[in-house]
Amino acid sequence: LDLVNNRLIPNAMEPRAAIGSYNRASDEYTLYVSNQNPHVERLLMTAFVMGLPEHKVRVIAPDVGGGFGSKIYLYAEDVCLTWASKKLNRNIKWVADRSEAFLSDAHGRDHVSHAEMAMDKDGKFLALRVHTHANLGAYLSTFASAVPTILYATLLAGQYSTPQVYVEVDSWFTNTAPVDAYRGAGRPEATYLLERLVTRCAWEMGLSQDEIRRRNFIQTFPYQTPVALQYDTGDFHACMDGANKLADVAGFEQRKAASAAKGLLRGIGYSSYIEACGIAPSNIAGALGARAGLFECGEVRVHPTGSVTVF
């Protein structure tokens, strides 16, 4: 199966805006900005761009407006305002217009993929192979390389007990706007690819969309996927039963016939997914390009001798 997940432009009604301020007495900066993640904004600005102690910069996001992920990115204007407020010793305000936001704010998606599924004679999944080309745009954004890796490739097992999963992602720089997190950031791309492939498998095997999924749902937990993630629990059959009941699938054929009598077509489609929320641990996320520390876990052991070890 060959699929294109086309490039999208967030295009929020409220363009990005920022005010940079500098307090000469305390040598501290304040940036008011419509950013979805002010903590990451401050971290990246101080550590990687301005070379300032983090406590010397305060980033405040009072009203963000629409963002959809595009306002997570650390934009050049935010840094320039902060720097210029000290240089000129005054507050500086900047607001993007709709045209420049449409062209230069971070875009989303832009994957071209080829996927293959091996099955046995009963429609049980044996192996999945995916090769994706991810367009990152002209240069890296905050989460550009994390989206098609830790947020996409690790979700391609879905909720199915496929024993073998192989994922290869090639990322490219092109003469386009940078791509960053957008509405699910990698996870919708994974679901779209996997569910389109599962639908195709049902057609090839002559099975219903309901049945192909039921035959392959994970039933034993905890379940270690072949692509890093471990699922602690889940009841996908119950979810499918509930969805069928809510949609009155049992009465679908009657509704389909009634539509046909009026010269109309009626169909029914299935899509199921599992989503990983959050990105961690930080060392893995960082290695895959998140460019920001996220959350970690720790352990303290008190030994019989009274000594303490912190992991």
Label each residue range with its predicted role.
Residues 59-62, 173-178, 214-224, 303-308:
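Short acidic (Asp/Glu) and glycine-rich catalytic loops that position anionic groups and cofactors
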Residues 15, 25-29, 52-56, 88-92, ...:
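Short coil/turn connectors at secondary-structure junctions
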